[in-house]
């Protein structure tokens, strides 16, 4: 039986495994995937990821690898062998790094290889932040150029804000995935994200998967919030 493929990826941003379980317990794999980041993975390692997969969840392991090509390739092989659904690397690591990772993943035998997604510009950054780094180019132009590089290197898609998703969807077909963080409900605060959009607007813009954290995990009724978002994006 084919696993469900909901469009929502719930970001589990917790400091302890107990806090993470409390965020996850009200949810269901029928309506969401889960994103596990560097804090939880550094503290609890593969065992916690395996625990969640045994409950039926597909896992986006969000470690944003960025290093020399062989180091990143080795790390991605290890993640792939863990059995996660999706992983990511920084596109700014360059073409050689990305192609080395793609080749490494193609060389191993797995029932289901993970989706390899490239990170463009973090949604916590905007044009003024980039200028402090000496980058004068506009964010949308950088994102489009990086996404083109990622696709040519063999990646399955990119992480981008919903604003850039609208531009990228005109450039790439649906075989190239757009994963969008910075999703907020209309009544939510932006938090630490600067380039944000609502769920329905993001899907309409061309995003394939929406990474949503606090609007669900900090809701008084997380499952109800998830169901409302799922219904909203399906009625677009």
UniProtKB/Swiss-Prot annotation:
<feature type="active site" description="Proton donor">
    <location>
        <position position="64"/>
    </location>
</feature>
<comment type="similarity">
    <text>Belongs to the OMP decarboxylase family. Type 1 subfamily.</text>
</comment>
<feature type="binding site">
    <location>
        <position position="214"/>
    </location>
    <ligand>
        <name>substrate</name>
    </ligand>
</feature>
<dbReference type="InterPro" id="IPR047596">
    <property type="entry name" value="OMPdecase_bac"/>
</dbReference>
<dbReference type="InterPro" id="IPR011060">
    <property type="entry name" value="RibuloseP-bd_barrel"/>
</dbReference>
<feature type="binding site">
    <location>
        <position position="213"/>
    </location>
    <ligand>
        <name>substrate</name>
    </ligand>
</feature>
<keyword id="KW-0210">Decarboxylase</keyword>
<keyword id="KW-0665">Pyrimidine biosynthesis</keyword>
<dbReference type="GO" id="GO:0006207">
    <property type="term" value="P:'de novo' pyrimidine nucleobase biosynthetic process"/>
</dbReference>
<comment type="function">
    <text>Catalyzes the decarboxylation of orotidine 5'-monophosphate (OMP) to uridine 5'-monophosphate (UMP).</text>
</comment>
<feature type="binding site">
    <location>
        <position position="123"/>
    </location>
    <ligand>
        <name>substrate</name>
    </ligand>
</feature>
<comment type="subunit">
    <text>Homodimer.</text>
</comment>
<keyword id="KW-0456">Lyase</keyword>
<dbReference type="GO" id="GO:0044205">
    <property type="term" value="P:'de novo' UMP biosynthetic process"/>
</dbReference>
<feature type="binding site">
    <location>
        <position position="184"/>
    </location>
    <ligand>
        <name>substrate</name>
    </ligand>
</feature>
<feature type="binding site">
    <location>
        <position position="13"/>
    </location>
    <ligand>
        <name>substrate</name>
    </ligand>
</feature>
<dbReference type="GO" id="GO:0005829">
    <property type="term" value="C:cytosol"/>
</dbReference>
<dbReference type="InterPro" id="IPR018089">
    <property type="entry name" value="OMPdecase_AS"/>
</dbReference>
<feature type="binding site">
    <location>
        <position position="193"/>
    </location>
    <ligand>
        <name>substrate</name>
    </ligand>
</feature>
<feature type="binding site">
    <location>
        <begin position="62"/>
        <end position="71"/>
    </location>
    <ligand>
        <name>substrate</name>
    </ligand>
</feature>
<dbReference type="InterPro" id="IPR013785">
    <property type="entry name" value="Aldolase_TIM"/>
</dbReference>
<dbReference type="GO" id="GO:0004590">
    <property type="term" value="F:orotidine-5'-phosphate decarboxylase activity"/>
</dbReference>
<dbReference type="InterPro" id="IPR001754">
    <property type="entry name" value="OMPdeCOase_dom"/>
</dbReference>
<dbReference type="Pfam" id="PF00215">
    <property type="entry name" value="OMPdecase"/>
</dbReference>
<feature type="binding site">
    <location>
        <position position="35"/>
    </location>
    <ligand>
        <name>substrate</name>
    </ligand>
</feature>
<dbReference type="InterPro" id="IPR014732">
    <property type="entry name" value="OMPdecase"/>
</dbReference>
<comment type="pathway">
    <text>Pyrimidine metabolism; UMP biosynthesis via de novo pathway; UMP from orotate: step 2/2.</text>
</comment>
<protein>
    <recommendedName>
        <fullName>Orotidine 5'-phosphate decarboxylase</fullName>
        <ecNumber>4.1.1.23</ecNumber>
    </recommendedName>
</protein>
């Amino acid at each position: 039986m084919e696993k469900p493929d909901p469009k929502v990826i719930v970001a589990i941003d917790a400091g302890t495994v107990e806090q993470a379980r409390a965020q996850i317990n009200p949810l269901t794999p029928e309506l969401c995937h889960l994103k596990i980041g560097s804090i939880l993975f550094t503290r609890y390692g593969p065992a916690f990821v395996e625990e969640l997969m045994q409950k039926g969840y597909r896992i986006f392991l969000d470690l944003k690898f960025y290093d020399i090509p062989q180091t990143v390739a080795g790390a991605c092989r290890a993640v792939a062998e863990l059995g996660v659904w999706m992983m990511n690397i920084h596109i700014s690591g360059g073409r050689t790094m990305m192609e080395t990772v793609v080749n490494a993943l193609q060389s191993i035998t797995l029932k289901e290889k993970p989706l390899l997604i490239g990170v463009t510009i973090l949604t916590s950054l905007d044009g003024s932040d980039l200028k402090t780094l000496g980058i004068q180019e506009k964010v949308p132009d950088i994102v489009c150029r990086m996404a083109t590089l990622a696709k040519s290197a063999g990646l399955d898609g990119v992480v981008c804000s919903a604003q850039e998703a609208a531009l990228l969807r005109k450039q790439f077909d649906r075989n190239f995935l757009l994963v969008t963080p910075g999703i907020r409900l209309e009544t939510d605060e932006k938090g630490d994200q600067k380039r944000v959009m609502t769920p329905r607007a993001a899907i309409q813009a061309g995003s394939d998967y929406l990474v949503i954290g606090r609007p669900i995990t900090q809701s008084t009724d997380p499952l109800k919030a998830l169901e409302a978002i799922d219904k909203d994006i399906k009625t677009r």
